[in-house]
Design a protein with these regions (language model features):
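Generic hydrophobic transmembrane alpha-helix motif, especially the helices
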Residues: 95, 99, 105, 126-205, ...
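Glycine-rich helix-loop "coupling/hinge" segments at transmembrane-helix boundaries
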Residues: 157, 168-171, 183, 198-199, ...
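Transmembrane alpha-helices
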Residues: 114-130, 219-251, 300
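Gly/Trp-centered helix-boundary motif
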Residues: 1-132, 136-137, 144, 272-303, ...
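Amphipathic alpha-helical segments that mediate coupling or scaffolding at interfaces
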Residues: 43-44, 109-112, 116, 137, ...
Length: 319
């Protein structure tokens, strides 16, 4: 009898495990940016000068934010300080002494930090926005657009900065927002020149040319390729623009063009000078505000120079 060969047992098929999906281009781009930011922060932390400046700025910003908790704003009004001794030197009751009206200089210092930082930061934002917009449009589009915008920029650069700011502040009137507008509208040309030079370099790179050849729109090229590469320059320039804005606010307030209803470090210096604090040797009146301005400007400069060095390989090589 013929034997029928046995068929081999069927081996169950292994389940097919789908391979993990590859990340899209947007995810890859964001991952690269996060990695780059992590590297920048690591280099920033290793820079002792940058960390000292950052700690100072955080401390002063915390003091400004907590001003209503640390001091009573009503003490800034002379009608509430008639019982305080005028020209009192620093003591346990009045940490920084009092002014000619009996107001606490420490309260003026704490609340003055809020206005000085507010003006410095908001004016810097306005400066960076206008300067970046003009620089990107001029550098990317070129032609008559670039020519017109650069002539406008040159016009602002030719006119002396401080006299123009004084005239505009006088026309607009004394207020915090007028000072912010004046500083922003007179300092953006320096940013636009820097951004335009960076855009002219970036738009000649191969990946930008390839994106154009593939039919990418101008807005896509600017948003995906130009701005991310100009960003580090803008970031470093921002930290260096804030001290300029603070010094400008101090100058305008000292000249009597600031908001008379708000305490600021510049206004404190102006009132101390008008009250004769220098001739009376009342150093406690003007010294805290002066030291505060110097420390904040120095701290922002330290952070800005460190960022500039981290983001610019040429500066790292020189060091």
């Amino acid at each position: 009898m013929r034997m029928i060969p046995e068929l081999p047992e069927a081996v169950p098929a292994e389940p097919v495990v789908p391979s993990p999906a590859l990340p899209g281009p947007h995810a890859v781009a964001w991952a690269r940016r996060r990695r780059a930011m992590a590297e920048i922060w690591l280099a920033f932390r290793r820079n002792r000068q940058a960390m000292v400046g950052l700690v100072i700025l955080v401390a002063i910003a915390a003091m400004a934010l907590l001003a209503p908790v640390l001091a009573n704003e009503e003490a800034l009004r002379a009608v509430n300080t008639v019982d305080n001794p005028p020209w009192a030197s620093p003591s346990r009751e009045f940490l920084f002494g009092t002014d000619n009206l009996g107001r606490s200089v420490a309260v003026q210092f704490v609340f003055g930090a809020r206005i000085s930082l507010l003006v410095g930061l908001f004016a810097t934002v306005l400066t960076i926005v206008i300067g970046t917009l003009v620089g990107v449009v001029a550098g990317f589009f070129g032609g008559w657009t670039e020519s017109a915008l650069m002539r406008l920029t040159d016009w602002f650069l030719v006119i002396p900065f401080l006299p123009l700011a004084i005239v505009l502040a006088r026309i607009l009137g004394p207020s915090v927002w007028s000072i912010i507008f004046v500083i922003g509208i007179t300092t953006w040309p320096y940013v636009s020149r820097l951004v335009r030079a960076q855009v002219l370099t970036v738009k000649q790179r191969l990946y930008v040319e390839r994106a154009r050849a593939m039919g990418a729109s101008r807005w896509h090229v600017v948003r995906r390729h130009i701005l991310p590469n100009v960003g580090p320059v803008i970031l470093a320039n921002t930290t260096l623009t804030v001290p300029i804005a603070i010094l400008t606010e101090t100058t305008l307030a000292f000249l009597g063009l600031g908001d008379p209803t708000r305490a600021s470090w510049g206004k404190t210096l102006q009132e101390a000078y008008d009250a004769g604090a220098i001739t009376r040797n009342a150093w406690w009146y003007y010294l805290p505000a002066g030291i505060g301005i110097v420390v904040v400007v120095l701290a922002f400069t330290m952070v800005g120079r460190a960022l500039e060095e981290i983001l610019d390989p040429r500066l790292r090589e020189r060091r």
